Structure formats: C-alpha cells, structure tokens
Regions:
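A surface-exposed partner-binding patch
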Residues: 1-70, 135-198
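Compact, glycine/acidic-enriched structural inserts
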Residues: 69-112
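An amphipathic alpha-helical core segment
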Residues: 95-169
Length: 198
C-alpha cells in the first residue's frame, strides 16, 4: 500500500463520515466484492484492485493502480479512466483527492436530481458498519422503477453487493474509453499490468 494510505489509516483509522454517508474501509474485508466486480472486465488485466472507501449506497472507490475507478453496485456500473503508471507524487495527489471529496455531493445517491441520504436515515435509521441502503426490487431487475424511496431498504452491504453482481452478465463501463486512453498515454494494457506486477 502507498505510504499515504498507511498515514490516513494511522490518523483516521477505518471510519465513517457524515453519519455513514462515506467510509474509509479495510481493503481485506471488501476484496471478494472488488474481485467479483472486476472479473471479465477490461480492468482485470491491470492487476489487483482494492477498496479504499465506500459510500452508503454501494459505491466502492479505488484510485491507486494507474486508474481511478468507482464501482457502483446499485446502478451496475464501473466508471473511471486509465491514467497509466502513477509516480509516487501523482498517486499521493490522487488518493488525497479521493479522501478530500468526502464532503462533496458526488458521494450521495440522487433520485430525480435530489440527494436522498438524509431521507434514508430518517426512514430506516443510521447504518451499521457493514450496512448500506439499497433498493428492492433491485435496479438490475426492473430498471428505473426500482429507484423510489418506497423501495429503499437497509441491507448487509457485502452480501448485497455480491448478490447484485450475480444478477447481471457484466457491469456497464461508463466515462471510460480504453482505446482512447491507451492511445493518449502511449501504452497497452499489458505494459500497464507489467508495471503494477508485485
């Protein structure tokens, strides 16, 4: 792990912010979820990915292996871009940026362009460490019709994220163009993977 992550863990520990909207997590506890979501995607060739943070609605964040990725388990997407190999300074800036966005709007989940976290807490109570808010029936089964406050439930986060992956063939890749990114940085997936090999 990069030294900046160790420093963040040393100062903050594994913790939550804003009443459970955002968490700094132990990567080991979420590795099976990350591995399942990465399987058979273009990112798999880049090496191992780790969960460094998550939000209350099943998004997992990883900024560390030459890419910046977000796995959105509810909307069944993986978004990000290939940067190539990070220098140590670039890695520190990227990871610092991830944790700096804790108070930003983009860790929220919205319905009709309105954030719902406060409503979720009011309806279902605060989250435990291993819980998340989800929709039942799942978006993967019925699409946009799932995304209502009436369908919002509190669930075991890891179990639910694994279940959501089982409901789909492949995650959708958003805001990501592999060929253009690779051409821009003048490399290939194999070269990037080799640089990240332990």
């Amino acid at each position: 792990m990069p030294s900046i992550i160790i420093d963040i863990w040393r100062h903050e520990g594994f913790c939550q912010f804003q009443n459970g909207l955002y968490y700094i997590v132990n990567p080991d506890e979420w590795q099976d979820v990350v591995d399942v979501w990465m399987e058979n995607t273009p990112f798999e060739q880049l090496g191992k990915f780790y969960a460094l943070a998550r939000n209350a609605f099943g998004c997992i964040y990883n900024p560390d292996t030459g890419t910046k990725l977000t796995i959105d388990t509810i909307l069944r997407t993986i978004s990000g871009s290939i940067k190539g190999y990070f220098t140590e300074k670039e890695r520190e800036i990227t990871i610092s940026g991830l944790f700096a966005m804790i108070s930003k709007k983009r860790v929220e989940f919205e319905i009709d362009d309105k954030p719902i976290f406060k409503k979720a807490v009011k309806k279902l109570g605060p989250l435990g460490w291993y819980e998340m808010y989800a929709f039942e029936p799942a978006f993967a089964l019925i699409g946009d019709a799932a995304l209502t406050m009436d369908n919002l439930v509190k669930v075991d986060a890891r179990v639910h994220m694994l279940l959501l992956r089982d409901l789909i063939d492949q995650p959708k890749i958003w805001s990501f163009n592999i060929e253009e990114d690779l051409k821009r940085i003048g490399t290939s997936l194999a070269e990037i993977a080799e640089k990240h090999r332990p």
